[in-house]
Amino acid sequence: GLQVMTGFTLRPDRAALEIASRVYNGNATPRHFLWWANPAVKGGEGHQSVFPPDVTAVFDHGKRAVSAFPIATGTYYKVDYSAGVDISRYKNVPVPTSYMAEKSQYDFVGAWCHDEDGGLLHVANHHIAPGKKQWSWGHSEFGQAWDKSLTDNNGPYIELMT
């Protein structure tokens, strides 16, 4: 079957965790699979997702909904953003929402916390991992209940994936 080996490296004097994985198909025939590596990052009012500048549209898991990005101008996940809403900001996303970008010529996706003046970048070679994705439970009561259920004391979070 499918096998995965993963190594984690912490280097001195660097604020980075390097993760290297190898996937091996032990089946007799080729197999297709999806691979998402996703760090969870702090969400909340000050959170903003940082997608590469060539990501101008996103879609949901099943490609049922498509939106301009980062400024949504239509309906996405049954939310009316027709006034032009920055959906890269956590505070503007009330419902559980995923943003998937199929391709990018850049090697990163990130998060920035305006309240803390800091953030992170998730770096992956775009020739190997061309897609970018974000998942959020949203800031409504429903989303807050899931955040509380799935974290210890850290509150809202966003999943970033490449």
Regions found by a protein language model. Give the residues of each.
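Low-complexity, acidic Ser/Thr/Pro/Gly-rich terminal tails and inter-domain linkers that flank the onset
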Residues: 1-13
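Short, well-ordered beta-strand segments enriched in hydrophobic/aromatic residues
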Residues: 6-8, 17-25
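A contiguous, surface-exposed recognition patch within enzymatic or periplasmic domains that forms
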Residues: 15, 26-162
